[in-house]
Amino acid sequence: MDKIVSPSKTKAIVEKYKFRFSKSLGQNFLIDQNILEDIVDGADIQPDDCVIEIGPGIGTLTQFIAEKAHKVVAIEIDRNLIPILKHTLADYQNVEVINQDVLKVDLHQLIADKFEGKPVKVIANLPYYVTTPIVMRFLEEKVPVDSLVIMIQKEVAVRMQAGPGTKDYGALSIAVQYYCNPEILLKVPPSVFIPQPKVESIVIKLQVYPEPKVKVERDDLMFALVKDAFGKRRKTLLNALSSGLLQLSKEIVRESLEAANIDENRRGETLTIEEYATLTKEVAARQ
């Protein structure tokens, strides 16, 4: 069938299937061809690439992805959209739609079963409430994907890319930048969606590193230190880390900071990932 990227075609499909938008699922459908093309261009899909699309909606973006990719597996949680997707994607033989929650899918098994060892990329339009759980699942579980191109709420994208010493720098910044290089591709105004969301969106590309940015033997300890350091942003590192969930003594914290050459009066938001890695090594040696 023809591309469905226009306000009139989108509305016609919604009316034909009597589809009701779910606020709880954050459903907003794109209606701007330029934005759709920019997303696909940003993903840099090669003819041999396979794509996992999360939240295909009515298949608007899926149609553009399918024209570039070797194969697309679109994971949609809303069963009411499945009949629509079967209709809008009927002409695309390289697309498979799965009606599941991506947080419950065995992603390693899916990739092994569906993609024949070919390169895998992720493209997604994620509502605010599941952005971090979905992104961190791919990264922490080391799901073998080359990149994630995701459309998310502006504030979350800014936090992912923020650097030390800025107001947006936090635990999410470090977690994302530990595993990948974040690059903001484009801003997306509310006017290019049906219905229009109340927030601005950003398309960000997370290029996954072959290995994490820094070498840390105990990344669980590093992220626990990060959580404690940012949990009490106004406190110095000495006070934040000695009164956090790790229950470290002031003596251990002071010795570890000194060995890592980090001033105990600094705050957590000023440390680089490399400094957190060094601090983790020193704390681990004293636990």
Swiss-Prot record:
Record-linked PROSITE patterns: RRNA_A_DIMETH, SAM_RNA_A_N6_MT
Catalytic activity as recorded in UniProt: adenosine(1518)/adenosine(1519) in 16S rRNA + 4 S-adenosyl-L-methionine = N(6)-dimethyladenosine(1518)/N(6)-dimethyladenosine(1519) in 16S rRNA + 4 S-adenosyl-L-homocysteine + 4 H(+)
E.C. no: 2.1.1.182
Database matches in InterPro entries: KsgA/Erm, rRNA_Ade_diMease-like_C, rRNA_Ade_Mease_Trfase_CS, rRNA_Ade_methylase_Trfase_N, rRNA_adenine_dimethylase, SAM-dependent_MTases_sf
Pfam families, sorted: RrnaAD (PF00398)
A single GO molecular function term of this UniProt record: RNA binding
Any one GO cellular component localisation term in the record: cytosol
Compartment annotation: Cytoplasm
Presence of the UniProt keyword RNA-binding in the record: yes
Annotated binding of S-adenosyl-L-methionine, by residue: 28, 30, 55, 76, 101, 125
Keywords: Cytoplasm, Methyltransferase, RNA-binding, rRNA processing, S-adenosyl-L-methionine, Transferase
Signal peptide: none
UniProt similarity note: Belongs to the class I-like SAM-binding methyltransferase superfamily. rRNA adenine N(6)-methyltransferase family. RsmA subfamily.
Protein name from the UniProt record: Ribosomal RNA small subunit methyltransferase A
Organism in which the protein naturally occurs: Alkaliphilus metalliredigens (strain QYMF)
Gene, per the UniProt record: rsmA
